[in-house]
A protein has these predicted regions:
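Extracellular glycan-recognition regions
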Residues: 1-166
Length: 166
């Protein structure tokens, strides 16, 4: 990310800039592959978890976890703001992107997102309290190769927003 700050050693605050997104082809017919992505590279099996709090303003404002092998193979999961509502969302990309989304019945201040990689499978969960986790997606991701794992944000249509990760 261009503008970010680490507070109290455990909180990352980033300004998500306008005109950013991660999406490949599909029936929408466009590809965008740029946005803030703060990551470390891991191999083998792992679990990644983050608490996300967004100041969502415009439709498609989004933030969460990203697991990325390269520009054609990646997963992003988190909250996406659509038509004034928060949604838990996952996009899985293997050459083309797909999108699964479930509207939340309210607007929680924060959501926890967790990704668990076992061999060539990734399970994605969300939680409202960091205690009870609900599975939102299971998908394939090539095993035996390094994966960039980290925090992402995107603002395709708005002027940007502030994203907080813990």
């Amino acid at each position: 990310p261009q503008q970010w700050e680490i507070k109290d050693g455990k909180t990352l605050v980033m300004d998500v800039p306008a005109k950013t997104d991660f999406w490949r082809i599909s029936h929408y017919g466009f590809t965008v592959d740029h946005g803030p992505f703060y990551y470390a590279t891991y191999g083998g099996e792992f679990e990644a978890k983050v608490k996300i709090t967004g100041n969502y303003v415009t439709t498609f404002d989004q933030m969460g976890l990203m697991l990325r092998i390269d520009h054609e193979n990646w997963i992003k999961a988190g909250v996406e703001y659509v038509d004034g509502k928060q949604n838990v969302s996952a996009v899985v990309t293997h050459r083309t992107s797909d999108w699964s989304v479930v509207q939340l019945p309210d607007a929680p201040r924060s959501i926890w997102i967790k990704a668990v990689r076992r061999l060539d499978a990734v399970e994605i969960f969300f939680s409202r309290d960091d205690k009870e986790y609900i599975m939102m997606r299971t998908c394939w991701l090539q095993d035996n190769c390094p994966v960039m794992v980290g925090l992402m944000g995107a603002c395709p249509d708005g002027k940007g927003f502030t994203a907080t990760f813990e």
